[in-house]
């Protein structure tokens, strides 16, 4: 058993309360490898932002659970080495699907876990979430639950259709489970293809597809039912067109990839939506930089020569999200 505090990590409780009060959102960036983690930590330190290192079940299997624990501890030490004396770093399980997975993460040093029972009948979701909460809270680990289903595919999570969160269920769910935050469905979706072309309209000036707006009425109804309660948005990558264009220019094939407009995420971040998940944008930034390097330097075979530019491109993306979208820069509890 390893407690997250021994690794220098923090849970989400205080940072979420501060974010709601301050009208900004904490970035939750998924990572699978060292370069992504380096880019996330460097961006967070340079912008003085709290940050959530987010790991899916599949990413944990890919990276290895033991190595992941030491990577998280190393992330804290790396932040200090870069000059941040009091980093606020969360290690969070994204879309945990069983009690056993959540328990394993808690026991190996995660400071926050998500138990996703949204695909289950309501009462089963309540029971599963409560079971995880009861275990996690013994170790001061925070728990994210979910009501509503996001469409799309990302990692091992997939759904054909989305189901908006029912605001009439949220009080009962939060009260009976004791969860610390709630992921809701308001029209975001997983992956780089968040909307079908027929759901969008074409901007006559650019010829680009423009997605439909998010269903903020659902968010507002949830906030009315649970005032001050931390809300989470999944599937919130914006799918930057410049990264898609670069990938396609250098041999990729991403047709009609479209994400969530950043102005809608800015609007969400100014409310009780205090955690916004971003994964696909990082994948796109990494892939674009690697494809560009391969095309421009076809004789290159040193991984550092293409993973380095990929890391730099991801860092640029993370800083942009922190400063220009989520508003979490200079929000560390201790700025020194």
Where are these regions (language model features)?
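An acidic- and aromatic-residue-enriched active-site/binding cleft used to recognize and process polar
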Residues: 148, 236, 281
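A short N-terminal beta->alpha junction/helix N-cap motif
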Residues: 3, 24-32, 59-60, 305, ...
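C-terminal alpha-helical cap/extension of soluble enzyme domains
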Residues: 249, 260-336
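Short catalytic/ligand-gating loop segments at beta-alpha or beta-beta junctions
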Residues: 233-239
């Amino acid at each position: 058993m390893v407690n997250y505090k021994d690794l220098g990590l923090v849970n989400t409780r205080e940072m979420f309360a501060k974010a709601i009060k301050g009208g900004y959102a904490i970035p939750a960036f998924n990572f699978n490898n060292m370069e992504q983690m380096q880019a996330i930590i460097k961006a967070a330190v340079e912008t003085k932002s709290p940050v959530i290192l987010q790991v899916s079940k599949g990413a944990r299997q890919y990276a290895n659970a033991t190595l992941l624990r030491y990577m998280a501890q190393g992330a804290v030490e790396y932040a200090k080495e870069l000059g941040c004396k009091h980093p606020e770093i969360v290690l969070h399980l994204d879309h945990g699907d069983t009690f056993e997975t959540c328990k394993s993460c808690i026991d190996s040093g995660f400071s926050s876990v998500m138990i996703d029972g949204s695909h289950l009948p309501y009462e089963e979701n309540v029971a599963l979430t409560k079971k995880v909460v009861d275990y996690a809270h013994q170790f001061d680990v925070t728990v994210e639950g979910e009501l509503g289903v996001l469409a799309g595919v990302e990692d091992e999570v997939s759904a054909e259709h989305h189901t908006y969160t029912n605001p009439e269920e949220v009080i009962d769910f939060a009260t009976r489970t004791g969860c610390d935050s709630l992921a809701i469905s308001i029209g975001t979706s997983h992956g780089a293809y968040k909307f079908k072309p027929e759901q969008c309209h074409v901007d006559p000036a650019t010829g680009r597809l423009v997605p439909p707006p998010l269903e903020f009425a659902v968010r507002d109804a949830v906030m009315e039912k649970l005032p001050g309660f931390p809300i989470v948005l999944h599937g919130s990558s914006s799918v930057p067109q410049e990264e898609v264009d670069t990938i396609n220019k250098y041999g990729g094939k991403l047709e009609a990839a479209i994400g969530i407009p950043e102005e809608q995420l800015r609007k969400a971040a100014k409310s009780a939506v205090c955690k916004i998940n971003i994964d696909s944008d990082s994948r796109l930034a990494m892939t674009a930089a690697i494809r560009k390097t391969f095309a421009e330097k076809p004789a290159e075979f040193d991984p550092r020569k293409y993973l380095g530019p990929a890391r730099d491109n991801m860092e640029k993306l993370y800083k942009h999200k922190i400063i220009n979208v989520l508003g979490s820069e200079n929000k560390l509890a201790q700025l020194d």
